Each structure stands twice: as structure tokens, then as C-alpha cells.
Amino acid sequence: MKKLFAVLLALAMLLGLMSFSVADEIDADLIAAAKEEGELVVYGSCEEEYLQAACDKFEQLYGIKVTHQRLSTGEVQAKIEEENGNPSADVWFGGTTDPYNICAKEGLLENYEAVNAAHLLGPAYRDKDGAWYGIYKGILGFMVNKEELERMGLETPQDWADLLKPEYKGLIWLSNYNTAGTAKLVINTMIQKYGHDEGIKYLVDLDKNIQVYTKSGSGPSKNVGTGECIIGIGFLHDGIYQIVDNGYDNIGLVIPSSGTSFEIGATAIFKGAKHMNAAKLWIEYALSPDCVNQADEFGSYQFLVLDNAEQPAQAAEFGLDPENVMDYDFEDAKENTTKYVGEVMEALGAAADDRFKTE
């Protein structure tokens, strides 16, 4: 018994030291300077519940007052571009990296070499210059209302090409290319999958079956369970949220059979942030279990990209494999997303109708 007690005590001490060492990596001077500033303003592109929890935990840990606003990644991009180096917020939290890359290219993000970036699972999960850092990974796919498809006598689409079938006309929802990072990822995915011209042609053909373009990337998922949307294109963790948290067990999740891409959900500091030290401390916090391990508790079921974080059990339960994805070219996306969005909208021509209104 004494030996067992000694082993347990030693293990507890070791775990305590490990926990301390992770927290202790953050420079004490940075913490002091951040507390001196006393404030932080966050634009969040993750879901509101997780955003609120992340901000509350930061306040609790450091005593720094946090103000936040939930916006889609496209809305944040537009706002930061308009403010042009004089941002009204300090940091960006959550949302796919394609809009982050555009802002980085435009010089609107602050490069910062984060200490806790050492815990990232690989170099793909950060900008090479430190403009942004990944905190999670989400798989792009389809969410379908199984009951409505059965009622209509329709098969569940299994691949991207299936979405072009005439029987799905008016049944598909996708987010707006102008406002949602998810939709920008769809553009890049199709261009990388099919080639430039064929990828744009695919999106023009897909448009014929699109009923609604939502402002936010999670918009389609929120309407599948009710039957208003029959087939939604988006991130599958948003579908898991609707099943687990909202009880919509009529939703089916589909990973396209010929391959799909993924988002890296990120965090970054805005160039010209008024609370720069608090912003840097936020990045360290966002790259720690203190922040990301609470994600699934608040309805965010993405795969985490830190080696010291606990993966959400819900993602594995639905059979999602975080490695079953195409080799996404982030550099091409960084250089060309804005151009590609313009080319798609131009190719749509008159089809770019009221469904794309952002007001």
C-alpha cells in the first residue's frame, strides 16, 4: 500500500510539474504588460457559445477585461480592410484561414512568434511568418436531412459530382462567397481538385441547384434538421453540433467519396492592435489546453491541432477521420483567393442574383 501511495504521489507531482511547465512557458513580463493594458477586444468567427467561453476563461485567468463580437470570417476581413491598420479589435479567433491569409498578404496581421506554437502538430498549422496560428481542423462535407430525402425518393449524394444532378435542384444550401470563409474554401477546393477552369465551371453548374447562400459558413447546418435545407455544404463539426446539442438525429453526415479539403481554424493579432501585449497573451492562451480543451463542452467539435490537447470524443464517434483529406495548397489559397472569388462571381454573371445580397 505504501508503495502504491508513493507511486501515485510521484505521478501526481509529475503531472503537476507538467501543467506548471506549460503555463510557465509564457513570459512573466508579457503577462504583467498585458495586465497593465487591462483590456482586449476580440472578433470571433467560431460559434458564439465557444467564443463567449474562451473570452470568459481568459478574463478569469488573467483579470483582463475582454469585449467580443461574433462575425463571419468574411465580415471580419471586410471590416479590417476598411479600417486599414487602425483596427477596432485586437485579435481574431476562429474561422477558416483563407480570409486570414488574404489579410496577412495585405499586411493587416501582426507577425508574432508564439512560444506555445511548439505544441502544434506540424508546420502546416501555422503561418510561416507567425501571422496566424491554427487551433483546430474541420472537415468539409455535406449534411443531409435523411427523412426529407427519403420522403422525396432521393438518394443521399456521396460525392461532389452528385450535387450537380438535376434532382437536387433547389435543395442545396451553401454559404456566400463574399462573406464566408467556408465558401472561399469551397472555391479553392474545387479549383485545386478539378483545375482552374473546370473548378469554376463546376461552381457555375452547382449554382443551378443552390436554393440559398447564407452569410455565415455554419448557416446551412442550422437549417438541415428542420428540413428547410435538405442538403447543406459546410463543415461536418457544425452538423455534429446540430445532432448532439440540438437533437436532430435526422441529419446524416457525408465525407465526399473522391476526397475533400479541410479548414484550419486560426487565431491572429491585427496590425496596429491597441492592446498589443494582451493580444500576444491571447495567442499564447489560444494555443493552450486552457482554451481549446473547453471547445467540445461548448458545442465546437473540431479536431484539435495541439499535442497537449484532448481530442473531442464526438468527432471520433461519427467516424470522421482528420487525415482523410486532400493535400490542400495553402500557399495558392493565400495568393489567389480574392482573385478566384472575383472570377467565380464574374462567371456566374446574371446568376449572381439576390441570393448573394449581404444586407
Q: What name fits each language-model region?
A:
Residues 320-359:
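Conserved C-terminal helix/tail region of periplasmic/extracytoplasmic solute-binding proteins
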Residues 138, 202-207, 213-214, 247-271:
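Periplasmic-binding protein-like
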Residues 41-55, 67-83, 87-228:
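Extracytoplasmic ligand-binding site segments that recognize negatively charged/polar headgroups
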Residues 1-37, 354-359:
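Short, low-complexity disordered leader/linker segments with a strong preference
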Residues 32, 161, 221-222, 280, ...:
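Alpha-helical segments flanking ligand/cofactor-binding loops in enzyme cores
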Residues 54-62:
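A short alpha-helix/helix-coil micro-patch that ends at or immediately precedes a cysteine
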Residues 98-102, 230-250:
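A ligand-binding cleft/hinge motif common to bilobed small-molecule-binding domains
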Residues 260-328:
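Mature extracytoplasmic/periplasmic domains
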